[in-house]
Amino acid sequence: MNLAWNKILEEVSKKISPQYYERFIDTLKLETLNSEKCTIIAPSATIKTHVERKYQSIIENAILEACGDKIPVEILIETKATSPLQSFLEKSFDQKDFQFNPDYTFETFIVGDCNRLAYTAAKECVRKPAEINPLYLFGSVGVGKTHLLHAIGSELIKKDPWKTVCYIDISSFMNEFRFALQSRELIESFKIKYQSYNCLLVDDIQLLSTNAEKTQDEFFALFNFLFERKRQIVIASDRPSSELTIHERLKSRFVTGVQADIQYPNKEIRKGIVTSHSKIMDLGLSEDVLEFLADQIEEDTRLLLGALNDIYLYKKSYSLLFLNLDKVKEIVKNRLYRKKNVEFSHDRIIESVAKEFNLDAAEIMGKSRKKELIIPRHICFYLLHNVFNVNKSQVGRLFQTQHTTVIHGLRKTEELLSDNKEIRFLVERISSKYKLQ
């Protein structure tokens, strides 16, 4: 039996690179080999799954070459006591445990100017994997980044069920890696798992920080491994890659593909989202209710979907067929952004800031990137959003700039307020002058 097995291994070695032969095939043990079946033992579920996906047909052909018979191959896992840590990792490596959200499809994604580039690029990742690589999606919470990641994963598997697709948020990746660092065997299993995927979908990459040195090194190595083999990589973040607090060498990898900014949806898109999901949920909402929801919830689309869930549960609880606008307002009142009855002029706020810095308001509102205009412009962002409750999208439209630029300006102003007493007093003066109590 050993002689036959050696011949089989010799045939397999001709078809697989030495690196992968040593990593996978060398770890297998022959249990039985007869005219009816060949039983092989793998040391772990990770190795078993990978060999079944990639090399089982090669082994079966090698048996035919060596023995002259077509014999089915069965791969079993070696029975041995495993630590809780090993069991955890083995379970986490099973792709069957993860299911893409069936509601997050390309068909249910409402397309508009705010997200058209991201949608088109995501579709292209399915049509021609690795043609756009990586695809980097960025935008604030609730604009549809996770929706597109799930849509890509679902479509790739639908197109080719043999594709191995991984969706993971970066926090989970970091936790798995920390566990795996406890032994050489586990870190090897970790590498095998992630290197085996045809597509990697990573959410919330902004949570990867410069403090996680080893995790960054591992992710960098994984990125290069998949990229060089033309495997699709899609990354989602709440900010442009230039604003990530990670090593420059990793940032440089993210800009090699397409960076797609997803803006907050306008009212037309929000109404499309509400209409589409209310039909799926069979809510039977009237036109005035749809208009109300689209008008009141302006930013995070998850709030829109949450409001629809509230309506659904209310209807189901009371066995109602129809809800009028007044009842809907009562049901979703805690989810709405409260619009303050404070009237003020945007121009007056901007003019006040300009006066403090001996500038013209038109300069602050303009496109110039002169250094002396940056801080006043950011202070305007801060006053309008944090003090007078103008949402970020409206601030962006007012200054004709991107949503991410507004977010960056708000962040910089908050840092400035904590360090600079003069700026803090300036903001307080303008706030007290215009804000009604």
Swiss-Prot record:
GO terms for cellular component: cytoplasm; plasma membrane. Residues 1-74 are annotated as: Domain I, interacts with DnaA modulators. Keywords: ATP-binding, Cytoplasm, DNA replication, DNA-binding, Lipid-binding, Nucleotide-binding. GO terms for biological process: DNA replication initiation; regulation of DNA replication. The keyword DNA-binding applies. ATP binds at residues 142, 144-146. It is found in: Cytoplasm. Disulfide bonds: none annotated. Its main location: cytoplasm. Residues 99-315 are annotated as: Domain III, AAA+ region. One of its GO terms (molecular function) is lipid binding. SUPFAM superfamilies: P-loop containing nucleoside triphosphate hydrolases (SSF52540), TrpR-like (SSF48295). It holds the Pfam family Bac_DnaA_C. Residues 316-437 are annotated as: Domain IV, binds dsDNA. It comes from the Bacteria. Domain I is involved in oligomerization and binding regulators, domain II is flexibile and of varying length in different bacteria, domain III forms the AAA+ region, while domain IV binds dsDNA. Oligomerizes as a right-handed, spiral filament on DNA at oriC. Belongs to the DnaA family. This is Chromosomal replication initiator protein DnaA. The lineage of its organism: Bacteria, Pseudomonadati, Spirochaetota, Spirochaetia, Leptospirales.
